[in-house]
Design a protein with these regions (language model features):
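A short helix-to-beta-strand connector/capping loop
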Residues: 51-58, 124-126, 168-170, 287
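Rossmann-like NAD(P)(H) cofactor-binding subdomain of soluble oxidoreductases
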Residues: 53, 61-143, 161
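Oxyanion-binding "anion nests"
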Residues: 194, 202-233
Length: 321
């Protein structure tokens, strides 16, 4: 009997558990801390705003139950990953496979998530992969198919997770650049904030320019960390633009739109914390990141939105390529 575990009962983690339970495995165990509002809602009603738990999905506040399975998906806030990794390193993790389903960088280090896990998990025979690419829960539940990418520093680990998760609903591709795909997935959230600001200002025509120039900037950041800048044009970054820059379901786009309107979003968004990390590293190492620098001034320094965003597109004239 195939079984997997999921750590994190938020929107995405619960969906991935539901997806696995309905398309790929016989049993899914979902974990969260017992005081988590998401966990309490699922425990009381067996549903959230998006889906109803299948009969083969089980909830637990006990990590011992999670580690009865070898395949574990993690979907929590990126800034809590190191703390979780330290906690679970106290368990016997030999032979375990972890799929990190979040999109972000650690702040302030700007470390990719697989490296955060590798630093804190000190045991042997523990394997890490990451998930990236487009897709919204609302679309998947309508059976709208999509594609995603799974990457790892271990070729066998990519194969392991793709064979476990592949279905007619989600086609998974093998990643070839774990650094580029993790950074690309994280920074698409930042670019989503920029797109939302343009929506809030009703400057829709600049979205095309944003889509053309942002991958160039993200590619620089990827290259700085030893990745392939072309990964910015793959599924994890450019391939996720429709779901992040245009969709009404994008939390990061909504964050930017409401910011431009002088309002606050009640939805969680990973983009702002990733933006902080990018700002620190780009300043320290002299990486040219004009879009991210402008966004930082708007989001964290209270800069005038219209003049700052306009200035971002009025920099010194240069060749496109």
């Amino acid at each position: 009997m195939k079984e997997i575990s999921v750590i994190g009962c938020g929107r995405w983690g619960t969906f991935l558990g539901w997806y696995a339970a309905n398309y790929r495995v016989d049993k899914v165990t979902l974990y969260d801390i017992p005081t988590s509002p998401n966990f309490l809602e699922l425990k009381e009603t067996r549903k959230n705003s998006y889906l109803t738990l299948s009969d083969n999905m089980f909830l637990t506040p006990d990590l011992n139950e999670i580690f009865k399975n070898d395949d574990i998906i993690i979907s929590i806030g990126c800034q809590h990953l190191r703390e979780l990794a330290k906690q679970i390193n106290q368990y016997n993790l030999s032979g375990k496979h972890f799929l990190l389903a979040m999109k972000g960088l650690e702040e302030p280090s700007a470390k990719i998530l697989v490296d955060v896990m590798a630093e804190e998990i000190t045991q042997d025979d523990v394997h890490f992969a990451c998930l990236g690419g487009p897709g919204h829960v609302q679309d998947y539940l309508k059976k709208v198919p999509s594609c995603a990418v799974i990457d790892s520093r271990e070729e066998a680990e990519k194969k392991h997770w793709i064979e476990l998760m592949q279905s007619e609903l989600i086609r998974f591709y093998y990643g070839t650049d774990v650094i580029g795909n993790q950074i690309g997935a994280a920074l698409k959230n930042v670019i989503g904030i920029a797109a939302g600001i343009l929506d809030g200002l009703e400057w829709y025509g600049l979205k095309g320019a944003l889509m053309a120039r942002a991958p160039v900037e993200v590619g620089r950041f990827i290259k700085h960390f030893g990745g392939n800048p072309m990964s910015a044009y793959g599924l994890a970054h450019l391939g996720d633009y429709e779901a992040t820059l245009f969709s009404r379901n994008s939390h990061n786009r909504l964050y930017g739109e409401l910011l431009a309107k002088g309002e606050q979003s009640s939805k969680s968004a990973e983009g702002p914390m990733t933006l902080k990390a990018v700002k620190i590293i780009s300043d320290r190492d002299g990486i040219e990141m004009p879009i991210c620098q402008a966004l930082y001034r708007v989001v964290f320094e209270g800069a005038d939105i219209k003049s700052t965003i306009r200035g971002m597109f009025e920099r010194e004239v240069k060749r496109e390529f």
